């Protein structure tokens, strides 16, 4: 909830709170059985937001963020919903499509349906089990996406990504001294 909601263009909501409330309201109205899985790497402040959601929607079913995507798929998950998260290609690799609502890194791939308006997003949510592709094709596209997004680009790009990931983990999980030492490496 404290991430940058407009890091990608065309997010059809002003912020993540509006997105999650619209999503929950639409799924409830359509009678769709769903669960909320908090982001596994969310910052501690987001726990407060989850508690606010539980107060607003007492019937809400929240699962542990420790549940893996593999466990969800093995349990019968038919669709994932994310504003623009990596879960879209992670689920696609396991044969599960997703619904997104911003121009995100996956938008050129057919393993996720990307809504361009609130009405289109609501329609997608009313039919979450719709699949345009076979599991094999979704898996192929997920691998193509992963290569283009994470591997293609050379050693310098990969090293920068790894350094940023280390910084992010320290910024959210450590004491200031370790973070300062890690930041010095960016000089």
Predicted regions and their residues:
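Flexible loop/turn segments at secondary-structure boundaries
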Residues: 1-6, 41-48, 69-72, 88-90, ...
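A donor-sugar binding/catalytic signature common to diverse glycosyltransferases
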Residues: 66-113
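Conserved catalytic-core segment of nucleotide-activated headgroup transferases in glycan assembly
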Residues: 1-52
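Nucleotide-activated donor-binding/catalytic signature segment of Leloir-type glycosyltransferases, i.e.
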Residues: 50-64
């Amino acid at each position: 909830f404290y991430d940058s909601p407009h890091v990608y263009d065309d997010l059809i909501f002003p912020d993540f709170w509006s997105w999650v409330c619209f999503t929950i309201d639409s799924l409830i109205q359509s009678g769709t059985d769903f669960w909320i899985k908090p982001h596994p790497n969310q910052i501690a402040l987001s726990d407060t937001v989850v508690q606010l959601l539980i107060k607003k929607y007492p019937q809400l079913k929240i699962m542990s963020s420790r549940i893996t995507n593999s466990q969800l798929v093995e349990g019968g998950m038919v669709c994932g919903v994310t504003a623009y998260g990596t879960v879209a290609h992670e689920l696609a690799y396991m044969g599960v499509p997703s619904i997104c609502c911003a121009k995100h890194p996956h938008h050129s791939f057919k393993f996720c349906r990307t809504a361009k308006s609130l009405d289109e997003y609501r329609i997608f949510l009313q039919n979450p089990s719709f699949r345009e592709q076979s599991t094999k094709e979704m898996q192929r596209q997920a691998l193509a996406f992963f290569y283009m997004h994470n591997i293609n680009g050379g050693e310098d790009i990969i090293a920068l990504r790894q350094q940023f990931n280390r910084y992010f983990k320290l910024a959210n999980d450590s004491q200031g001294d370790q973070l300062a030492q890690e930041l010095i490496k960016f000089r």
